[in-house]
C-alpha cells in the first residue's frame, strides 16, 4: 500500500462517483475517503470536459483544478479516477500525492502476462 492509513480524495466524473466504484473498493479495505463537494465537482467536470478533453491550454483550467484540490483539505492523497486527470496533473506540473488507476491497471495486466513491470517514474 502506498498510502496506508491515509484518506483518499476521489476525483472522478459524476457518473463514476455515482457508480461508487472507488468508494466500494475503499470501504471493502476499511479505508477512509472523501469526494468533492457540489461546487468542487462542478469545477472538476469543467476541468475534465471543457479543459482537458477540449484540448485547452493547461493555463485555462489551472485555477479551477487547484480550487478543487484546495476544497478537499481532508484528503491525504488523490485517486485520479478519470483518464483525463493524470494528463491534467502532468500538464500542470503538479506534485501531489496521487494514484493513477489506469497506470495501476496497465502494471497489473503486464505482470499478469508474465512480464516484469518497470519502477514507478
What are these model-predicted stretches?
Residues 1-121:
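Non-catalytic structural scaffold of enzyme domains
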Amino acid at each position: 500500500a502506498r498510502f496506508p492509513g491515509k484518506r483518499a480524495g476521489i476525483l472522478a466524473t459524476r457518473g463514476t462517483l455515482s457508480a461508487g466504484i472507488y468508494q466500494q473498493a475503499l470501504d471493502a479495505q476499511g479505508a477512509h475517503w472523501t469526494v468533492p463537494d457540489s461546487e468542487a465537482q462542478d469545477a472538476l467536470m469543467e476541468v475534465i470536459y471543457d479543459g482537458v478533453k477540449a484540448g485547452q491550454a493547461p493555463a485555462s483550467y489551472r485555477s479551477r483544478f487547484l480550487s478543487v484540490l484546495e476544497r478537499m483539505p481532508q484528503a491525504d492523497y488523490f485517486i485520479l479516477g478519470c483518464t483525463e486527470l493524470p494528463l491534467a496533473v502532468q500538464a500542470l506540473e503538479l506534485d501531489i500525492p496521487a494514484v493513477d488507476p489506469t497506470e495501476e491497471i496497465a502494471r497489473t495486466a503486464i505482470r499478469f502476462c508474465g512480464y516484469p513491470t518497470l519502477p514507478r517514474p
